[in-house]
């Protein structure tokens, strides 16, 4: 299993923030759903920080673990094909399993 770091930019206008909420769609939710669908495994991203409803980001960092054999550097291009226009994965790379975006 490898750990992948994503740098994510988004226009938060239509979202209830980063963190999954019961009252509306969030950036984290969209990423989890699209990554899980793409890799056909349960993917849960962990973000460096949370943003509130309506807040934008040019480079929020998140990680996820996966069994995929796809090179991590190609994930950003591949996943952007299925993300809405207001969420873009700017970069993706493999990081050490000990890497955590908050610490």
Protein language model regions, located:
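Structured-RNA-binding interfaces characteristic of tRNA pseudouridine synthases
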Residues: 1-103
């Amino acid at each position: 299993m490898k750990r992948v770091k994503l740098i994510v930019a988004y226009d938060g206008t239509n979202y209830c923030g980063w963190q999954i909420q019961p009252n509306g769609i969030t950036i984290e939710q969209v990423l989890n759903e699209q990554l899980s669908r793409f890799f056909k495994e349960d993917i849960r991203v962990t973000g460096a920080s949370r943003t509130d409803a309506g807040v934008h980001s040019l480079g929020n960092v998140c990680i996820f673990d996966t069994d995929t054999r796809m090179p991590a550097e190609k994930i950003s291009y591949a996943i952007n094909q299925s993300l809405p226009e207001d969420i873009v994965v700017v970069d993706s790379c493999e990081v050490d399993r000990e890497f955590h975006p908050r610490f």
